[in-house]
Curated annotation (Swiss-Prot):
Main enzyme class: oxidoreductase
Catalytic activity: L-saccharopine + NADP(+) + H2O = (S)-2-amino-6-oxohexanoate + L-glutamate + NADPH + H(+)
Protein name (record): Probable saccharopine dehydrogenase [NADP(+), L-glutamate-forming]
Family designation: Belongs to the saccharopine dehydrogenase family.
Gene transcribed to yield this protein: sdh
Length: 480
């Protein structure tokens, strides 16, 4: 019998657990503070195959130490800040570890110690990071083995409501706290595009959207706005590419065409992305969003004045962004904006959110952005029976001695209505598969690593196919 210790019971845990409990010779101990989540993710499973422990893992991890030496592998799905603490216990008891998170500096520092203990600390086993890196390295390694060199890499990834559920001005919904999404929306981006080092300031990132079309297996074209994602330069080294060969290195995020970028820019324009504590939010008896906007913008509290003030503030900000964007002379394709049309979309979005209504009360979270998050969490949540979709696409240009090819690797995965979301499936299932490989003794690498070598990515990607999570690969020669 193989024993697995699973820490955490969030939305990713169920697909990982479901995968592992398909094995008759696996026993899983699941630990979480939340008994309702433990009951939910284990519902329907044979009670002889698992054990649940209700415990505050974040503060009482030491109480679980006895389970580490008894386990063939530990899965950490608790907050990433605790992974290194879990890893130290794994090293102490010579037990392997799987996480879905990026390799932190604290985790990386444990690599030599883990090697000496004969322990594998395998990270980045989700979608992004995870499937994205594995599918990229599969193409890159295959190209190198056949004498090719990668000159261009463009990768897009998005987790979105499926088209029939994208029924709001954002074209987006949240299945967990919006704070992380909003925070990342205001980060700058750096990348290499056709030999040009592009630096996109945080404030104009959502004004430099690229038009992206991804075709599904039925030939249906899905239209997106693409936005650059943080710093793409480190991936030249991470993917073992020759910097002298690479002219384009870009990683970006997908949103449905038309809405999200407009709404983000408009909310920034009126000051709702501020992270400063604002005492006006804490007024006794509460404050409406309308009243708060009136105070933020300094206008009269009547419909015509407020509407004019909102429209003019957003328009002025959009024009400012366009001027700044045009002055930077970027070299990548950018969707031209109709400012008047975008302003009207934003205003209708404000009305839909209730920002112009005296009836929509602010849930005070001390800062404008956190109070906005509370509103978005209420308005942009998934309803019963709705599903999400994950879209991942890599585009490579590979030069061979006698030809140049465009190679595309793409994944479209839909969530299950009233079941696991596509996001949770594409994170939890890879975690489960990696755990199975380790527990079955099919890995030899030790230390702190991601799944970017054939030892990991080949079997994991192959097993994902049987779970209906498959990267479809195509190639086409580029005629000169």
């Amino acid at each position: 019998m193989k024993n697995i210790l699973l820490l955490g019971s969030g939305f990713v845990a169920k697909p990982a657990l479901d995968y592992l409990l398909k094995r008759e010779d696996y026993f899983v101990t699941i630990v979480s503070l939340f008994q309702n989540e433990l009951d939910s993710i284990t519902k329907g499973h044979d009670t002889s195959k698992f054990k649940t422990i209700q415990l505050d893992v974040m503060n009482k991890l030491n109480e679980l130490e006895e389970y580490f030496p008894k386990s063939d592998c530990v899965i950490s799905l608790i907050p990433a800040t605790l992974h290194s603490t879990v890893a130290k216990l794994c090293i102490k008891h010579k037990t392997h570890l799987v996480t879905a998170s990026y390799i932190s500096d604290d985790m990386k520092a444990l690599s030599e110690e883990a090697k000496e203990a004969g322990v594998l600390l395998l990270n980045e086993l989700g979608l992004d990071p995870g499937i994205d890196h594995m599918s990229s390295m599969k193409i890159i390694d295959h190209a190198k083995e056949n004498g090719g060199k990668v000159t261009s890499f463009v990768s897009w990834c998005g987790a979105l409501p499926s088209t029939e559920c994208a029924d709001n001005p954002f074209g987006y919904k949240f299945s967990w706290s919006p704070r992380g999404v909003l925070s990342s929306a205001t980060l700058s981006a750096n990348f290499l595009w056709e030999g040009h080092n592009e630096e996109v300031p945080a404030n104009i990132k959502w004004a430099v959207l690229q038009p992206i079309v991804v075709e599904d297996s039925n030939g249906v074209k899905m239209e997106f706005d693409g936005v650059p994602n943080r710093n793409s330069f480190p991936y030249i080294e991470q993917y073992n590419l020759n910097a002298k060969d690479v002219t384009t290195m870009f990683r970006g995020t997908l949103r449905w065409k038309g809405g999200f970028g407009i709404m983000i820019r408009a909310l920034v324009a009126v000051g709702l992305f501020s992270t400063e504590v604002d005492a006006r939010l804490a007024v006794e008896g509460g404050i409406s969003w309308r009243n708060y906007l009136v105070q933020l913008l300094g206008c009269n509290d009547n419909d015509s004045d407020l509407l004019y003030c909102v429209e003019s503030t957003i328009k002025e900000y959009f024009e400012k962004l366009k001027t700044e964007r045009d002055g930077l002379q970027f070299h990548f394709p950018i969707i031209p904006r109709d400012i008047e049309k975008d302003v009207q979309h934003a205003v209708e979005g404000f009305k839909w959110l209730g920002l112009l209504s005296a009836d929509e009360k602010v849930v005070n979270k001390n800062t404008p952005i956190d109070s906005l998050c509370a509103l978005l969490e209420k308005k942009l949540s998934y309803k019963a029976g709705e599903r999400d979709v994950v879209v991942l696409e890599h585009n490579f240009v590979v030069q061979y001695a006698d030809r140049t090819e465009k190679e595309v690797s793409s994944l479209i995965c839909y969530g299950i209505p009233n079941g696991s979301s596509a996001t949770s499936l594409t994170v939890g299932v890879p975690v489960g598969i990696a755990t199975e490989l380790i527990a079955d003794g099919k890995t030899t690498t030790r230390g702190v690593v991601g799944p970017v070598t054939p030892e990991f990515y080949l079997p994991i990607l192959e097993k994902l196919k049987s779970e209906n999570i498959e990267m479809i690969e195509t190639k086409q020669e580029i005629k000169k």
